[in-house]
């Protein structure tokens, strides 16, 4: 089943018939594969590891699939398709990336849902593109078309990162935040509560949903001897975390994981401010799976230390899988759950 933006792209497939096409920030469907019904060759870059895993089995000679914040080479394309991102600031980065990989006078297509801010693209397109025009609209989505008219500047990550100092209960740390990664330029309430009641940890510790690396940096500030692994589903977050670690002279293994699936072996501790906040059934199910999978990933005596919005239904899952619910701290918005594996 194709998403609405993907359906809008397919019904305009004559725009890139017989061409070499790059797709940026594609969604959780098989659109890159279906583009081959019209395009000569397709390369797709996903910033979401779950979306990348959905497409991965379909890779072939004319369908190259990548995960990350950049492509591994400097290949240029006839057409670049951008799915307009939820984070508006990320759109500017994707436009720069598209410009770098377009042939001279190459074609740019930008698609997105009306409610997702797609109309902002008209003002966001940089000078090296022609003014975009609305090509089509359907299923509450819009498709804009533009053309590369000047050479785009090369991507320099330092232009897309914000560095700032953050005070934590463990001391001051430097945070490096790439566009599209959650940041308040201060310690958010949930993470502050989590770090204010941080148990002493040991051995191998997993930071799940690491984001820009705030929790890991604070943890290593207090206990530099820990062997921390940082996982996230978002490519920009993973790169941000790597930059944060380098800025603080810390070392940790940072890699993508869809849930805990890509982690290996058992951990002495799992720590997280899980990225499940909206209370929708889909994210609630993911949260429940996180609790269940955590039990399977912890050694005997392992510590599970997370913070969550108090309205989210964690307690039942924790009771089911950990056999008890231990709330070590709470306020009017958040609860810190701190459990141990006893058997």
Curated annotation (Swiss-Prot):
InterPro entries: Mtase_sm_N, rRNA_ssu_MeTfrase_C, RsmC/RlmG, SAM-dependent_MTases_sf, Small_mtfrase_dom. Keywords: Cytoplasm, Methyltransferase, rRNA processing, S-adenosyl-L-methionine, Transferase. Its EC number is 2.1.1.172. This is Ribosomal RNA small subunit methyltransferase C. It comes from Shewanella sediminis (strain HAW-EB3). It is an enzyme of class 2 (transferase). Its main location: cytoplasm. It is found in: Cytoplasm. HAMAP family: 16SrRNA_methyltr_C. Belongs to the methyltransferase superfamily. RsmC family. The lineage of its organism: Bacteria, Pseudomonadati, Pseudomonadota, Gammaproteobacteria, Alteromonadales. The gene is rsmC. Specifically methylates the guanine in position 1207 of 16S rRNA in the 30S particle. Monomer. The keyword Nucleus does not apply. It catalyses: guanosine(1207) in 16S rRNA + S-adenosyl-L-methionine = N(2)-methylguanosine(1207) in 16S rRNA + S-adenosyl-L-homocysteine + H(+). PANTHER family: RIBOSOMAL RNA SMALL SUBUNIT METHYLTRANSFERASE C. GO terms for molecular function: 16S rRNA (guanine(1207)-N(2))-methyltransferase activity. GO terms for cellular component: cytoplasm.
